[in-house]
């Protein structure tokens, strides 16, 4: 499939989506949001892909939503256009997704990064939800995912003031998984994605589902769901291979079945 605003590549069992609107600082217009979602969905159904990496340029991950596309909208226009419906489809991707962020990840860019399962940041990264400065509020999940990631007090601080935080503060707050030097960002992100992609495909998908369920259920419900997923791994070839390899003190050879 041909894309105009992103680049799609592969590295071993990793699908790589690179945001590519440099003239607009990777601002997320409706075309780009749809292309990111469509590419991720294509990679999600590819049996040879075990992880998806989303990244931008060294200077900017994504500077936010494309304000020029939204500025003149009426309520009816915004409601009918439903700019963010693509994000619901992206959230349904079952393959583990890793965001590799350098430079600015603001507004929709921060929200896109938070939709990923791991967020690896360069030491140059800056995060924020500055929508309040435009007379609006986060509209792509920022008020919900940011609060779950860093807690109410910190989320209120960022959303109500619109201030940005650097990579170190983002890591201390629990927003990012790890921080690396800018030159090491893509090698580190590829290494993490490759490690995940080499695990059992069904097991990583179930693990992602179990963790995500913890945000939407009681502890008792989450534990029951986890237990059922755990039991279901025992019908897979990968469970047999993984445990046999452990007993035999060798590396497992998963077939993703």
From Swiss-Prot:
Gene3D superfamilies: 2-enoyl-CoA Hydratase, Chain A, domain 1, Lyase 2-enoyl-coa Hydratase, Chain A, domain 2. Its EC number is 4.2.1.17. Disulfide bonds: none annotated. One of its GO terms (biological process) is fatty acid beta-oxidation. It comes from the Bacteria. Keywords: Fatty acid metabolism, Lipid metabolism, Lyase. Pfam families: ECH_1 (PF00378). Belongs to the enoyl-CoA hydratase/isomerase family. Could possibly oxidize fatty acids using specific components. This is Probable enoyl-CoA hydratase echA8. It comes from Mycobacterium leprae (strain TN). The lineage of its organism: Bacteria, Bacillati, Actinomycetota, Actinomycetes, Mycobacteriales.
